[in-house]
Structures are given as structure tokens and as C-alpha cells.
């Protein structure tokens, strides 16, 4: 595990502030939005569809804390772009939006460095003000929308209106108190992690924050490599993973196979009270990966000689299958959902940090074993040939 302290020169202009929103392309946006509201504690925020004058795409916007998801579906049978995307990738993340200052400057610099500009800057407005946008191409078919608000006071963005329907079930469900997006992870095919991470360093002037390789993260069967990139202020963190050769197909390779290439593997949602959050998420019916009891037996033993003290009850953490990673300065608590759709692609993470800015490297091996158990149930923990080529899907 390597932590990087060199941020490089501060960009002259064009700040990246934070994650603005995450856009999903799905087969049925209404049902997908309802799923995330019921299972994960989101609430409807805004809507754009036929009733608001949008004739091609319907969008349901949901929010929890400062986390905003936008679920989008095509309205017409001739929408080839969204149709082809769904056939190839299934339901999943299409766009990760960043709120920025000086969108024009960021786009200009990215263009000079060779980035593909999917859509040049444009402005939309309504009675609440103006917003400037631009869209850049990143790994796979994923894009980044830059969002610059120009004295905008609306509930979401121009063209969106308040939802007209209120689900009477939602107020009766326990609150989950997920607050912000901590990080968003992109999976790449083998040998593409470096180029994907370099894209951020070169085009957005991000810097390396953290990394691990397959000598540090591996099980008997599989392994991975990961590089985390971040903006100058370190408010946006983007881990980039790739599989490393092993005896069997890794969960990273399984993702790449079922996603049809690179894409967003998981979104980490931060909370200040993970125990209450996970209790309530389980009450709502959310499924999580389970760490074995041996993990907690070893953890208890190791913590006896650690320089930090975990405040939470180890019995409760074990009961809820929450994982712990730590160093001499602090610790983090984390847990991962099972896939949020039928394809074993996108899942979510819930994380709580106590003076620890890592990504759970100490848990990677245990997590990989839990993932491998799920892979085996799906029939996907398959052998690889000696040269690392898969022997079957």
C-alpha cells in the first residue's frame, strides 16, 4: 500500500468542488428510483419527463443527505444510444457529475491535453437561475458532466420539477442517514488501470492519492491492483481497479465480463453512524456481503496490540458483518451490498471514517473471499489458463 503526498502544482483556475450527482441508465427509471428509495433510504427530489416537456428521456432524481442519484430511461423505442447501452452494460452508472468553478477553463485545458469532449460547454436556465454544463469522456462508456451553477437556486437543475407523487410508505421506514459520496470506483480490463488513472492526472490535473498491487491484495485464487486519483482539494476520490492474473477469475474480471468492459463498480456512501445505518438498511431489506466469524476472531486478537481503540462494540460489528481497517492514526468501518441488479456489476458501500483516509486495504483479502463465495454461487469462480486467459464465461 502506498500513500502519495505530492499534489503537484495547484491549478491556476477551474476548481473541482465535489461530486454533484451520479446518473444511471436503466430499463425502468420509475421502478429503479423506487428501489433505491425503499431499500437504501433515498427520497424523491425532482422529475423530468413527458409531463414537463421531455419527449425522449425520463429522469427520476432521488436524494439522501448530499448524495444525488439520477435514474434515466428512454421513452421511445427508437432511442438507439440508450438501447444499445442497456443491452451491452445492463442497468448501471452512465455519468459521474462534478460541481466545478470555471467550467470553460477546465474544458479548454482538458481539450489541450487530448481529452475527448463529448459536448462543449452550454448553458441552461429557468426562473431559478443559470447552470453551465460540459461533458467529457472517461473510461469505457462512462462520462463526466461538469456542472457550474451561476447563482442557481432551484431544487436540482433547470428543466426539472418537484415530484408530483409522494410514496406514503417512505416516511414509515427507518432513516439511514447516509450523508455524502465518499468515493466512486471504476473497474478496468487487465492492463488498462494505468491509462485510465493517467487520464485524470493528465486531463483534469488530479493527482495520485493511494495505491495497492497484487502482491498486497490476493487470495488463493485471484488478486487486484488499484490506484486512487483525486482533485487538488481531495474532495473527489476515484479508485481505479484492474484484475491481476490468478488461478481463477477475479471479481474484477467478473465485473468486466458482465459489464461489457470498463465501468463503475461501486459507489461508497459515507455516514457518521454506520451501526444505525446498517441496522436500518437491513430492516429495509438491503442485502450485504457477510464476513466470516474467523475475520472477527483475528481482528480482536490484532487490536489488542494496536495503537488505536475501536469505539464501537466488536460484538455489534460482528453481528452486522461490518469490517474494520486501521493504522496507527485511526480506523474505518465499511460494509458492501450485494449487486444492486441481476448482473453482478454495480454495488454500494457504506463507510464511516475515524481519522483514517484509506480504502480498506486490510480488508481486501477478506472481501475477496466473500466475493469469491458469491461468484461460486453464480458459477463464475472459473479456472484461468496458465497465460491468464479465461477458460469460459
Swiss-Prot record:
Fe cation binds at residues 183, 266, 349. Residues 18-149, 180-338 form the VOC domain. GO terms for biological process: L-phenylalanine catabolic process; tyrosine catabolic process. Gene3D superfamilies: 2,3-Dihydroxybiphenyl 1,2-Dioxygenase, domain 1 (3.10.180.10). It is an enzyme of class 1 (oxidoreductase). It is found in: Cytoplasm; Endoplasmic reticulum membrane; Golgi apparatus membrane. The modification N-acetylthreonine is found at residue 2. InterPro entries: 4OHPhenylPyrv_dOase, 4OHPhenylPyrv_dOase_C, 4OHPhenylPyrv_dOase_N, Glyas_Bleomycin-R_OHBP_Dase, Glyas_Fos-R_dOase_dom, VOC. The keyword Cell membrane does not apply. It catalyses: 3-(4-hydroxyphenyl)pyruvate + O2 = homogentisate + CO2. Its cofactor is Fe cation. It is linked to Defects in Hpd are the cause of tyrosinemia type III. This is 4-hydroxyphenylpyruvate dioxygenase. It comes from Mus musculus (Mouse).
Amino acid at each position: 500500500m502506498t500513500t502519495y503526498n505530492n499534489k503537484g502544482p495547484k491549478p491556476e483556475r477551474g476548481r473541482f468542488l465535489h461530486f454533484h450527482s451520479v446518473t444511471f441508465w436503466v430499463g425502468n427509471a420509475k421502478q429503479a428510483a423506487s428501489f433505491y428509495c425503499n431499500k437504501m433510504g433515498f427520497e424523491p427530489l425532482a422529475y423530468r419527463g413527458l409531463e414537463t416537456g421531455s419527449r425522449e428521456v425520463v429522469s427520476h432524481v432521488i436524494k439522501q443527505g448530499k448524495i444525488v442519484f439520477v435514474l434515466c430511461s428512454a421513452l421511445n423505442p427508437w432511442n438507439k444510444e440508450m438501447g444499445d447501452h442497456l443491452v451491452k452494460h445492463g442497468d448501471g452508472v452512465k455519468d459521474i457529475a462534478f460541481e466545478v468553478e470555471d467550467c470553460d477553463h477546465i474544458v479548454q485545458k482538458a481539450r489541450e491535453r487530448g481529452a475527448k469532449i463529448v459536448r462543449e460547454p452550454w448553458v441552461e436556465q429557468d426562473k431559478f437561475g443559470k447552470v453551465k454544463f460540459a461533458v467529457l469522456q472517461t473510461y469505457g462508456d462512462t462520462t463526466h458532466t461538469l456542472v457550474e451553477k451561476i447563482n442557481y437556486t432551484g431544487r436540482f437543475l433547470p428543466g426539472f420539477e418537484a415530484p408530483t407523487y409522494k410514496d406514503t410508505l417512505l416516511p414509515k421506514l427507518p432513516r439511514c442517514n447516509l450523508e455524502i459520496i465518499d468515493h466512486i470506483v471504476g473497474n478496468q480490463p487487465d492492463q488498462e488501470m494505468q491509462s485510465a488513472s493517467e487520464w485524470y492526472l493528465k486531463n483534469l490535473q488530479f493527482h495520485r492519492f493511494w495505491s495497492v498491487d497484487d502482491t498486497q491484495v490476493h487470495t488463493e485464487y485471484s488478486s487486484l491492483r488499484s490506484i486512487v486519483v483525486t482533485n487538488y482539494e481531495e474532495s473527489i476520490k476515484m479508485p481505479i481497479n484492474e484484475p491481476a492474473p490468478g488461478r481463477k477469475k477475479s471479481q474484477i474480471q467478473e465485473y468486466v465480463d458482465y459489464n461489457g468492459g470498463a465501468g463503475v463498480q461501486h459507489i461508497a456512501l459515507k455516514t457518521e453512524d454506520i451501526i444505525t445505518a446498517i441496522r436500518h438498511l437491513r430492516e429495509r431489506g438491503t442485502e450485504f456481503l457477510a464476513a466470516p466469524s474467523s475475520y472477527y476472531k483475528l481482528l480482536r486478537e490484532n487490536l489488542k496490540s494496536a495503537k488505536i481503540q475501536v469505539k464501537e462494540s466488536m460484538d455489534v460489528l460482528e453481528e452486522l458483518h461490518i469490517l474494520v481497517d486501521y493504522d496507527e492514526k485511526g480506523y474505518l468501518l465499511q460494509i458492501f451490498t450485494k449487486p444492486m441488479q441481476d448482473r453482478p456489476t454495480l454495488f454500494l458501500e457504506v463507510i464511516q471514517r475515524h481519522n483514517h483516509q484509506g480504502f480498506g486495504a486490510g480488508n481486501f483479502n477478506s472481501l475477496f473471499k466473500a466475493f469469491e463465495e458469491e461468484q461460486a454461487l453464480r458459477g463464475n469462480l472459473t479456472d484461468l489458463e496458465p497465460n491468464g486467459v479465461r477458460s469460459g464465461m
